[in-house]
């Protein structure tokens, strides 16, 4: 039987977990095997910016950061389960990637 590997990425931790919960509910309803969600390392993108625009004065810095949270889910590729997966309402700032493996 084929397996579907689902990779979720997003900057909002709560939205990523919400989509994981929806996938888990679909797996329980359809009775397919589910492995995960496996938390992958969170990527931190840090951008230091000087507060002073003209370069005069003391060097004080603002540090802006964006965190990218990732989850990995393996699920059996049952036709009924995959059709329901395609219908999930995913927020637009969450990336979802589905790869079928044999």
UniProtKB/Swiss-Prot annotation:
<comment type="similarity">
    <text>Belongs to the universal ribosomal protein uS10 family.</text>
</comment>
<dbReference type="GO" id="GO:0003735">
    <property type="term" value="F:structural constituent of ribosome"/>
</dbReference>
<dbReference type="InterPro" id="IPR018268">
    <property type="entry name" value="Ribosomal_uS10_CS"/>
</dbReference>
<comment type="function">
    <text>Involved in the binding of tRNA to the ribosomes.</text>
</comment>
<dbReference type="GO" id="GO:0015935">
    <property type="term" value="C:small ribosomal subunit"/>
</dbReference>
<dbReference type="InterPro" id="IPR036838">
    <property type="entry name" value="Ribosomal_uS10_dom_sf"/>
</dbReference>
<comment type="subunit">
    <text>Part of the 30S ribosomal subunit.</text>
</comment>
<dbReference type="GO" id="GO:0006412">
    <property type="term" value="P:translation"/>
</dbReference>
<keyword id="KW-0687">Ribonucleoprotein</keyword>
<dbReference type="InterPro" id="IPR001848">
    <property type="entry name" value="Ribosomal_uS10"/>
</dbReference>
<dbReference type="InterPro" id="IPR005729">
    <property type="entry name" value="Ribosomal_uS10_euk/arc"/>
</dbReference>
<dbReference type="Pfam" id="PF00338">
    <property type="entry name" value="Ribosomal_S10"/>
</dbReference>
<dbReference type="GO" id="GO:0000049">
    <property type="term" value="F:tRNA binding"/>
</dbReference>
<protein>
    <recommendedName>
        <fullName>Small ribosomal subunit protein uS10</fullName>
    </recommendedName>
</protein>
<keyword id="KW-0689">Ribosomal protein</keyword>
<dbReference type="InterPro" id="IPR027486">
    <property type="entry name" value="Ribosomal_uS10_dom"/>
</dbReference>
């Amino acid at each position: 039987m084929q397996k579907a590997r689902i990779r979720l990425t997003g900057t909002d931790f709560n939205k990523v977990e919400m989509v994981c919960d929806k996938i888990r509910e679909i797996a329980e309803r359809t009775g397919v095997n589910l492995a995960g969600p496996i938390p992958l390392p969170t990527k931190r993108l840090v951008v230091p910016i000087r507060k002073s625009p003209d370069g005069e004065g003391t060097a004080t810095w603002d540090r802006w950061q964006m965190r990218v949270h990732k989850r990995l889910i393996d699920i059996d590729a049952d036709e009924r389960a995959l059709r329901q997966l395609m219908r999930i309402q995913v927020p637009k700032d969450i990336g979802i990637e589905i790869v079928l493996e044999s």
